[in-house]
Amino acid sequence: VEKERYQEREISSTYVREELRLGHMETVNVLLGRPYSIYGIVSKGKQLGRQLNLPTLNIYPPDSKLLPPNGVYASITRLDGKEYFGVTNLGVRPTLDDSPLLSVETNLFDYNDDAYGHYIEVQLMHFLRQEMKFDSIETLKKQMESDASFAKEMFLLKN
């Protein structure tokens, strides 16, 4: 039986891990045959996203989970049997508190309910940019709005 190939390369777990470490989510998702996902129970954060009118669902991946680079991703989140488009930050929140704890914070488009304690699946679809420290909360908010606008265009959603 001949091995499956993608982009002239044999598909293997090594190939998937290499692409994941580079943040090449489209390739990872093709190689896996499904979207790369991070799962978890929504935890209450510091409510800073809510104060910025950009609320997030926060989960904490297990240390054993192989993750792509810290950064911002266009994402699809499965919650209570429905799928929501959004933007996810994977990282340590350098502008807010530079937490040593890695978190996955997802702002969903068109979702405003309380999801604390709910199990979610966050599918990372496209790497948008590296995580970075901003000079102010206002600059961070403007960038988050820009990230959301870009992701909506990617998903062909109206603003």
Predicted regions and their residues:
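Classical nucleotidyltransferase
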Residues: 1-55, 78, 135-139
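Phosphate/ribose-recognition catalytic cores of enzymes acting on nucleotide-derived substrates
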Residues: 44-159
